[in-house]
Amino acid sequence: MADDTFITTAFANIGLSGDYGTSWFLTRLIGPSRALELMLTASRITAKECLDLGIVNTITPYEEVRNRARQLALDIANGPRTALRYMKENINRAVNSDLKTCLSGEARALMQCSRTDDHKEAVRAFMEKRPPIFNNPR
């Protein structure tokens, strides 16, 4: 999030109750009490407050936002695709599943990842004390 920006729900200012899952997402991000306060007051939340509440992961100076976003995208795109896919699945599963289900899913994913060329490359790179170079065709 750019350091000079803010967010607001603003629905209370226009006589609407909210849309696009605002209540669902905010409640899960910051808890029901804070979500309700933001919805009822329509107050502006600064970038720093968003960071403190856990709504965003980082604050970046405005001039650097585009470059930071591009670098983050490249870092992810250059990662081990199969492992990254399973990481996303694991996190998504964890939202609504019990621990046993999550552990089972993680174990299956780990076994799949352990058979990939990316894992083999990562082990070689670790032993050779160098960063891994994953096979990510474009």
Regions flagged by a language model, labelled:
Residues R93-A94, K129-I133:
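A short structural micro-motif
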Residues D98-C102, N136:
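Short beta-strand->loop
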Residues N13-L16, A94-D98:
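Glycine- (often His-adjacent) and acidic-residue-rich active-site loop
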Residues M1-L84, M111, R115-T116, K120-R124, ...:
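Crotonase-fold acyl-CoA enzyme core
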